[in-house]
């Protein structure tokens, strides 16, 4: 059965000398994989459409197992991302997280829209690190995780937040922070932004400016929480950490 889907290429795997297995996150079916025969040949009609991060329409012969990519039409090649090493690094982190966090053929139009919108914001010049933090925060419920972002994880009151506790699963107020010796001290902006990122509609994102120190604290909170509860290892995260050392 042939299906036309709108999707974004989130992974490619070489198969033999000339073929690729292309993994697409689609609006209609979620994550699907298909064999792109001859796609590694420079003159192949599938060469461009099967590139990582390409947003397009794909005609796939679907089956119970691996499908076959017949043809495609590019909507956006994400050129702006491809031409910038830092954008490529953050976009690669986002698509790898999407790949590792999802199962095959699990329909989730919300997640497709979030992936699409995030990558297009990157192309438009929005801070890629902030976008990756937003995406990482919004992926938490997709993975079945809901940290205490609105109230203290211990007293459940909306009060002054001074730390994040991985053990308790959320922010801690000044009265209860001492209960976790391994708490992560955070500024007020970290709580406000993570809470905002968790709840707000990504389509309503305007001009956003976040201090480097705040971004660093947010990254520490999210990465530590993911490490404890998620169990997903991302190669791109390590590359981002290495790349950050060279960024002025």
UniProtKB/Swiss-Prot annotation:
Keyword Ribonucleoprotein assigned: no
Cellular component terms (Gene Ontology): bacterial nucleoid
A Pfam family hit: RecO_N
UniProt keyword list: DNA damage, DNA recombination, DNA repair
N-terminal signal peptide: none
Superkingdom field: Bacteria
GO biological process: DNA recombination; double-strand break repair
Function of the molecule: Involved in DNA repair and RecF pathway recombination.
Recorded family membership: Belongs to the RecO family.
Protein name: DNA repair protein RecO
Species this protein is from: Bacillus mycoides (strain KBAB4)
């Amino acid at each position: 059965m042939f299906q036309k889907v709108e999707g974004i290429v989130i992974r490619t795997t070489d198969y033999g000398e000339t073929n690729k297995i292309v993994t697409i996150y689609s609006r209609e079916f979620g994550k699907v994989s298909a064999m792109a025969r001859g796609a590694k040949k420079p003159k192949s009609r599938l060469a461009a459409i099967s590139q990582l991060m390409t947003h397009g329409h794909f005609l796939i012969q679907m089956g119970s197992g691996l499908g076959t990519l017949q043809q495609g039409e590019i909507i956006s090649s994400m050129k702006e991302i491809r031409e910038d090493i830092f954008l490529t690094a953050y976009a690669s982190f986002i698509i790898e997280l999407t790949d590792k966090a999802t199962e095959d053929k699990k329909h989730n139009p919300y997640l497709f829209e979030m992936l699409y919108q995030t990558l297009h914001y990157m192309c438009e010049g929005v801070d890629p690190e902030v976008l990756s933090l937003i995406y990482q925060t919004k992926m938490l419920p997709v993975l079945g995780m809901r940290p205490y972002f609105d109230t203290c994880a211990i007293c459940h009151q909306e009060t002054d937040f001074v730390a994040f506790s991985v053990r308790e699963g959320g922010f801690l107020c000044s009265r209860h922070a001492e209960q976790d010796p391994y708490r992560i001290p955070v500024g007020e902006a970290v709580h406000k932004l993570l809470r905002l990122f968790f709840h707000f509609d990504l389509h309503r994102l305007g001009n956003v400016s976040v201090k480097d120190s705040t971004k660093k604290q947010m990254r520490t909170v999210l990465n530590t929480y993911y490490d404890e509860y998620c169990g997903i290892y991302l190669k791109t995260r390590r590359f981002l950490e290495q790349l950050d050392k060279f960024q002025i």
